[in-house]
Amino acid sequence: MRQRTIVCPLIQNDGAYLLCKMADDRGVFPGQWALSGGGVESGERIEEALRREIREELGEQLLLTEITPWTFSDDIRTKTYADGRKEEIYMIYLIFDCVSANREVKINEEFQDYAWVKPEDLVHYDLNVATRKTLRLKGLL
């Protein structure tokens, strides 16, 4: 089984948290709301990977003013690729508390939507298991 280290930013701006709705046809949690993030590449430092993933998935304009390592978790997930292939992967999630100076987001093809969500509204979103676990640990659910 392949192993991947995943960096995930929990991005907050003015009391709201950024959630992204995964594309329906790919990923580990198709069609569900999640944190952004992705894999650390070989030879890449963790914070470099986090900043790269944010640029790739959320655009160049989102300005982070704080990045603080917060927690980690792990599990085994089945990833669905755009061509329909499936793969079981051991995932290690490194989660960061982040503060954004703005809300200028431009999502890539991995997502179909995004939202800045106040903590009291998080219960109204179809959150994936990993995101739900993270938000519970943070005391937001």
Curated annotation (Swiss-Prot):
Catalysed reactions listed for this entry: a ribonucleoside 5'-triphosphate + H2O = a ribonucleoside 5'-phosphate + diphosphate + H(+); a 2'-deoxyribonucleoside 5'-triphosphate + H2O = a 2'-deoxyribonucleoside 5'-phosphate + diphosphate + H(+); dUTP + H2O = dUMP + diphosphate + H(+); dTTP + H2O = dTMP + diphosphate + H(+)
Molecular-function GO term, any one: dCTP diphosphatase activity
Keywords on record: Hydrolase, Magnesium
General function of this protein: Catalyzes the hydrolysis of nucleoside triphosphates, with a preference for pyrimidine deoxynucleoside triphosphates (dUTP, dTTP and dCTP).
Assembly and oligomerization: Monomer.
Similarity annotation: Belongs to the Nudix hydrolase family. NudI subfamily.
Full protein name: Nucleoside triphosphatase NudI
Organism annotation: Escherichia coli O139:H28 (strain E24377A / ETEC)
